[in-house]
Amino acid sequence: MDKSILKKFAIESREMLMTAVENKLNKYYVDEELEKTQSGDLIILKNNRITLQPLTFEEFNKRTTLISRIKDLSEDGSFENGKKRVIEETAYTWFNRIVAIRYMELNDMLPLTKDNQSLGIRVLSSINNESHPEILKIGNLTNTGLDLKIDFDKYNKLINENEQFNYVLNLICNKLGTIIPQVFDGITDYIDLLLPENLLSDNGFVNKVIKEVPEGNFKEGVEIIGWLYQYYNQIEKDRAMSSKGVYKKSEIPYVTQLFTPDWIVKYMVENSLGRYWVEHNGDKDLINNWKYFIKDN
Protein backbone atom coordinates (compact mmCIF):
# COMPACT_ATOMS: atom_id res chain seq x y z
CA MET A 1 0.00 0.00 0.00
CA ASP A 2 1.61 3.24 -1.14
CA LYS A 3 0.77 5.70 1.64
CA SER A 4 2.38 8.64 -0.16
CA ILE A 5 -0.14 8.20 -2.98
CA LEU A 6 -2.99 7.91 -0.49
CA LYS A 7 -1.92 11.05 1.38
CA LYS A 8 -1.64 13.16 -1.76
CA PHE A 9 -4.96 11.86 -3.06
CA ALA A 10 -6.85 12.45 0.21
CA ILE A 11 -5.53 15.98 0.79
CA GLU A 12 -6.29 17.04 -2.77
CA SER A 13 -9.70 15.37 -2.64
CA ARG A 14 -10.73 17.38 0.40
CA GLU A 15 -10.15 20.68 -1.37
CA MET A 16 -11.72 19.39 -4.57
CA LEU A 17 -14.90 18.14 -2.91
CA MET A 18 -15.33 21.17 -0.66
CA THR A 19 -15.19 23.43 -3.71
CA ALA A 20 -17.65 21.23 -5.60
CA VAL A 21 -20.07 21.08 -2.66
CA GLU A 22 -19.87 24.84 -2.15
CA ASN A 23 -20.67 25.41 -5.83
CA LYS A 24 -23.67 23.10 -5.55
CA LEU A 25 -24.88 24.78 -2.35
CA ASN A 26 -24.66 28.25 -3.90
CA LYS A 27 -27.09 27.19 -6.63
CA TYR A 28 -29.84 26.97 -4.01
CA TYR A 29 -29.36 30.51 -2.66
CA VAL A 30 -29.94 29.32 0.89
CA ASP A 31 -29.06 32.75 2.33
CA GLU A 32 -31.71 34.59 0.28
CA GLU A 33 -35.27 35.44 1.31
CA LEU A 34 -37.32 33.93 -1.52
CA GLU A 35 -41.04 33.84 -2.20
CA LYS A 36 -42.58 30.46 -2.94
CA THR A 37 -45.13 29.78 -5.67
CA GLN A 38 -46.33 26.50 -7.11
CA SER A 39 -46.50 25.66 -10.81
CA GLY A 40 -47.98 22.21 -11.32
CA ASP A 41 -45.64 19.71 -9.69
CA LEU A 42 -42.86 22.25 -9.28
CA ILE A 43 -41.95 24.92 -6.73
CA ILE A 44 -40.74 28.33 -7.92
CA LEU A 45 -38.55 30.35 -5.55
CA LYS A 46 -37.68 33.94 -6.40
CA ASN A 47 -37.30 37.51 -5.23
CA ASN A 48 -36.81 40.77 -7.11
CA ARG A 49 -33.21 39.83 -7.99
CA ILE A 50 -33.08 36.10 -8.65
CA THR A 51 -35.24 33.17 -9.70
CA LEU A 52 -34.15 29.64 -8.90
CA GLN A 53 -34.48 26.82 -11.37
CA PRO A 54 -37.84 25.14 -10.57
CA LEU A 55 -37.59 22.56 -7.79
CA THR A 56 -39.54 19.38 -7.27
CA PHE A 57 -41.35 19.04 -3.94
CA GLU A 58 -38.60 16.62 -2.87
CA GLU A 59 -35.85 19.11 -3.73
CA PHE A 60 -37.73 21.93 -1.99
CA ASN A 61 -38.03 19.87 1.20
CA LYS A 62 -34.33 18.97 1.05
CA ARG A 63 -33.45 22.65 0.63
CA THR A 64 -35.53 23.42 3.73
CA THR A 65 -33.67 20.70 5.65
CA LEU A 66 -30.37 22.12 4.39
CA ILE A 67 -31.17 25.58 5.77
CA SER A 68 -32.09 24.08 9.14
CA ARG A 69 -28.86 22.10 9.21
CA ILE A 70 -26.81 25.22 8.45
CA LYS A 71 -28.39 27.00 11.42
CA ASP A 72 -27.91 23.98 13.70
CA LEU A 73 -24.21 23.54 12.89
CA SER A 74 -23.19 27.18 13.25
CA GLU A 75 -20.68 27.55 16.07
CA ASP A 76 -20.96 31.32 16.43
CA GLY A 77 -24.59 31.86 15.41
CA SER A 78 -23.71 33.18 11.96
CA PHE A 79 -25.17 31.71 8.79
CA GLU A 80 -21.76 31.82 7.07
CA ASN A 81 -20.16 29.67 9.76
CA GLY A 82 -23.01 27.18 9.46
CA LYS A 83 -22.52 27.02 5.69
CA LYS A 84 -18.81 26.32 6.17
CA ARG A 85 -19.57 23.48 8.58
CA VAL A 86 -22.18 21.95 6.24
CA ILE A 87 -19.73 22.12 3.32
CA GLU A 88 -17.08 20.32 5.41
CA GLU A 89 -19.55 17.70 6.59
CA THR A 90 -21.00 17.04 3.14
CA ALA A 91 -17.63 16.89 1.38
CA TYR A 92 -16.33 14.33 3.87
CA THR A 93 -19.52 12.28 3.67
CA TRP A 94 -19.26 11.95 -0.10
CA PHE A 95 -15.52 11.25 0.11
CA ASN A 96 -16.16 8.46 2.59
CA ARG A 97 -19.08 6.99 0.65
CA ILE A 98 -17.38 6.94 -2.74
CA VAL A 99 -14.13 5.54 -1.32
CA ALA A 100 -16.10 2.82 0.48
CA ILE A 101 -17.96 1.93 -2.72
CA ARG A 102 -14.63 1.75 -4.57
CA TYR A 103 -13.28 -0.65 -1.96
CA MET A 104 -16.38 -2.83 -2.14
CA GLU A 105 -16.60 -2.95 -5.93
CA LEU A 106 -12.95 -3.98 -6.31
CA ASN A 107 -13.34 -6.72 -3.70
CA ASP A 108 -16.68 -7.96 -5.07
CA MET A 109 -18.45 -6.96 -1.85
CA LEU A 110 -21.15 -4.55 -3.08
CA PRO A 111 -24.40 -5.84 -1.55
CA LEU A 112 -26.92 -4.78 -4.21
CA THR A 113 -29.42 -7.67 -4.10
CA LYS A 114 -32.41 -8.07 -1.79
CA ASP A 115 -30.46 -10.54 0.31
CA ASN A 116 -27.45 -8.19 0.27
CA GLN A 117 -25.21 -10.18 -2.04
CA SER A 118 -22.86 -8.92 -4.75
CA LEU A 119 -23.89 -9.02 -8.41
CA GLY A 120 -20.34 -8.41 -9.58
CA ILE A 121 -21.44 -5.08 -11.07
CA ARG A 122 -19.14 -2.12 -10.59
CA VAL A 123 -20.67 1.24 -9.69
CA LEU A 124 -17.79 3.65 -10.29
CA SER A 125 -15.83 1.90 -13.01
CA SER A 126 -15.77 -0.96 -15.50
CA ILE A 127 -13.80 -4.17 -15.21
CA ASN A 128 -12.84 -3.77 -18.89
CA ASN A 129 -11.60 -0.19 -18.33
CA GLU A 130 -14.44 1.25 -20.38
CA SER A 131 -15.13 4.94 -19.94
CA HIS A 132 -18.63 4.39 -18.50
CA PRO A 133 -19.51 2.79 -15.15
CA GLU A 134 -20.91 -0.71 -15.49
CA ILE A 135 -23.96 0.15 -13.39
CA LEU A 136 -25.27 2.52 -16.10
CA LYS A 137 -25.54 -0.20 -18.73
CA ILE A 138 -29.23 -0.82 -19.33
CA GLY A 139 -28.73 -4.55 -18.87
CA ASN A 140 -27.39 -3.93 -15.38
CA LEU A 141 -30.01 -1.34 -14.43
CA THR A 142 -32.76 -3.79 -15.41
CA ASN A 143 -31.08 -6.79 -13.77
CA THR A 144 -33.84 -8.56 -11.83
CA GLY A 145 -31.45 -9.15 -8.95
CA LEU A 146 -30.68 -5.45 -8.50
CA ASP A 147 -32.47 -4.10 -5.42
CA LEU A 148 -32.80 -0.44 -6.40
CA LYS A 149 -36.05 1.50 -6.72
CA ILE A 150 -35.28 3.01 -10.12
CA ASP A 151 -37.91 5.30 -11.64
CA PHE A 152 -37.07 4.83 -15.32
CA ASP A 153 -39.37 7.66 -16.41
CA LYS A 154 -37.36 10.00 -14.21
CA TYR A 155 -34.05 8.40 -15.19
CA ASN A 156 -34.70 8.74 -18.92
CA LYS A 157 -35.53 12.45 -18.57
CA LEU A 158 -32.10 13.22 -17.15
CA ILE A 159 -30.14 15.02 -19.81
CA ASN A 160 -26.65 13.53 -19.47
CA GLU A 161 -24.68 10.65 -18.04
CA ASN A 162 -23.48 12.65 -15.02
CA GLU A 163 -27.05 13.36 -13.93
CA GLN A 164 -28.03 9.73 -14.50
CA PHE A 165 -25.04 8.58 -12.47
CA ASN A 166 -25.85 10.92 -9.57
CA TYR A 167 -29.43 9.64 -9.54
CA VAL A 168 -28.31 6.00 -9.42
CA LEU A 169 -25.54 6.74 -6.90
CA ASN A 170 -28.05 8.25 -4.47
CA LEU A 171 -30.26 5.17 -4.83
CA ILE A 172 -27.27 2.92 -4.13
CA CYS A 173 -26.38 4.96 -1.03
CA ASN A 174 -29.97 4.62 0.18
CA LYS A 175 -29.72 0.86 -0.30
CA LEU A 176 -26.37 0.65 1.47
CA GLY A 177 -27.76 2.79 4.28
CA THR A 178 -29.94 -0.15 5.31
CA ILE A 179 -26.82 -2.32 5.63
CA ILE A 180 -24.01 0.05 6.67
CA PRO A 181 -25.82 2.98 8.35
CA GLN A 182 -22.60 4.29 9.90
CA VAL A 183 -21.38 5.33 6.43
CA PHE A 184 -24.42 5.64 4.21
CA ASP A 185 -27.19 6.77 6.53
CA GLY A 186 -27.86 9.64 8.91
CA ILE A 187 -29.25 13.08 8.09
CA THR A 188 -29.03 12.50 4.36
CA ASP A 189 -31.64 14.73 2.71
CA TYR A 190 -29.34 17.72 2.30
CA ILE A 191 -26.34 15.42 1.73
CA ASP A 192 -28.11 14.00 -1.33
CA LEU A 193 -28.99 17.49 -2.53
CA LEU A 194 -25.35 18.58 -2.40
CA LEU A 195 -23.88 15.62 -4.28
CA PRO A 196 -21.25 17.28 -6.53
CA GLU A 197 -21.93 17.55 -10.23
CA ASN A 198 -19.84 16.10 -13.08
CA LEU A 199 -18.41 13.26 -11.01
CA LEU A 200 -17.67 11.29 -14.19
CA SER A 201 -15.94 14.09 -16.08
CA ASP A 202 -12.19 13.97 -16.69
CA ASN A 203 -11.61 16.25 -13.68
CA GLY A 204 -14.42 14.76 -11.58
CA PHE A 205 -13.92 13.01 -8.25
CA VAL A 206 -14.86 9.52 -9.44
CA ASN A 207 -12.26 9.75 -12.19
CA LYS A 208 -9.72 10.94 -9.63
CA VAL A 209 -10.33 7.89 -7.42
CA ILE A 210 -9.99 5.49 -10.35
CA LYS A 211 -6.89 7.04 -11.90
CA GLU A 212 -4.87 8.11 -8.87
CA VAL A 213 -5.28 5.22 -6.43
CA PRO A 214 -4.06 1.93 -7.95
CA GLU A 215 -6.55 -0.92 -7.61
CA GLY A 216 -4.02 -3.00 -5.71
CA ASN A 217 -4.14 -0.57 -2.79
CA PHE A 218 -7.82 -1.35 -2.29
CA LYS A 219 -7.15 -5.09 -2.37
CA GLU A 220 -4.62 -5.08 0.47
CA GLY A 221 -7.31 -4.83 3.12
CA VAL A 222 -9.79 -2.47 4.69
CA GLU A 223 -7.00 -0.48 6.38
CA ILE A 224 -6.93 1.76 3.31
CA ILE A 225 -10.17 3.35 4.54
CA GLY A 226 -8.52 4.27 7.83
CA TRP A 227 -5.44 5.75 6.21
CA LEU A 228 -7.53 7.80 3.80
CA TYR A 229 -9.59 9.09 6.73
CA GLN A 230 -6.46 10.22 8.56
CA TYR A 231 -4.86 11.84 5.52
CA TYR A 232 -8.11 13.56 4.53
CA ASN A 233 -8.09 15.35 7.90
CA GLN A 234 -4.31 15.89 8.02
CA ILE A 235 -4.24 19.61 7.23
CA GLU A 236 -7.04 20.45 9.67
CA LYS A 237 -5.39 18.28 12.33
CA ASP A 238 -2.07 20.10 11.92
CA ARG A 239 -3.78 23.49 11.97
CA ALA A 240 -5.81 22.70 15.09
CA MET A 241 -2.85 21.25 16.98
CA SER A 242 -0.66 24.26 16.17
CA SER A 243 -3.18 26.67 17.67
CA LYS A 244 -2.73 27.64 21.31
CA GLY A 245 -6.35 28.15 22.23
CA VAL A 246 -9.11 25.81 23.31
CA TYR A 247 -10.28 23.50 20.54
CA LYS A 248 -13.61 24.27 18.95
CA LYS A 249 -16.22 21.52 18.92
CA SER A 250 -15.66 21.00 15.19
CA GLU A 251 -11.89 20.60 15.73
CA ILE A 252 -12.05 17.83 18.31
CA PRO A 253 -12.40 14.96 15.78
CA TYR A 254 -9.33 16.18 13.89
CA VAL A 255 -7.05 15.93 16.93
CA THR A 256 -8.55 12.87 18.65
CA GLN A 257 -9.77 10.47 15.95
CA LEU A 258 -6.57 9.04 14.50
CA PHE A 259 -6.40 5.81 12.54
CA THR A 260 -4.86 2.89 14.41
CA PRO A 261 -3.30 0.23 12.15
CA ASP A 262 -4.33 -3.38 12.63
CA TRP A 263 -0.99 -4.48 14.09
CA ILE A 264 -1.12 -1.85 16.84
CA VAL A 265 -4.60 -2.98 17.86
CA LYS A 266 -3.41 -6.59 18.03
CA TYR A 267 -0.31 -5.59 20.01
CA MET A 268 -2.39 -3.70 22.57
CA VAL A 269 -5.03 -6.43 22.95
CA GLU A 270 -2.56 -9.32 23.15
CA ASN A 271 -0.44 -7.58 25.78
CA SER A 272 -3.30 -6.29 27.94
CA LEU A 273 -6.52 -8.29 27.85
CA GLY A 274 -4.72 -11.28 26.34
CA ARG A 275 -2.04 -11.31 29.05
CA TYR A 276 -4.69 -10.96 31.78
CA TRP A 277 -6.64 -13.92 30.37
CA VAL A 278 -3.59 -16.20 30.14
CA GLU A 279 -2.36 -15.29 33.64
CA HIS A 280 -5.75 -15.97 35.22
CA ASN A 281 -6.91 -18.96 33.17
CA GLY A 282 -3.70 -20.75 32.29
CA ASP A 283 -4.72 -21.12 28.64
CA LYS A 284 -1.16 -20.68 27.37
CA ASP A 285 -1.79 -22.42 24.03
CA LEU A 286 -3.41 -19.20 22.83
CA ILE A 287 -0.02 -17.51 22.87
CA ASN A 288 1.17 -19.67 19.98
CA ASN A 289 -1.15 -17.76 17.61
CA TRP A 290 -0.27 -14.30 18.92
CA LYS A 291 2.25 -12.51 16.75
CA TYR A 292 2.79 -9.44 18.94
CA PHE A 293 2.67 -10.92 22.44
CA ILE A 294 5.76 -10.11 24.55
CA LYS A 295 6.63 -13.02 26.79
CA ASP A 296 8.07 -12.45 30.25
CA ASN A 297 11.75 -13.25 30.67
Segments the model singles out, each with a brief description of its role:
Residues 1-297:
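Preference for the N-terminal adenyl/adenosyl cofactor-binding alpha/beta module
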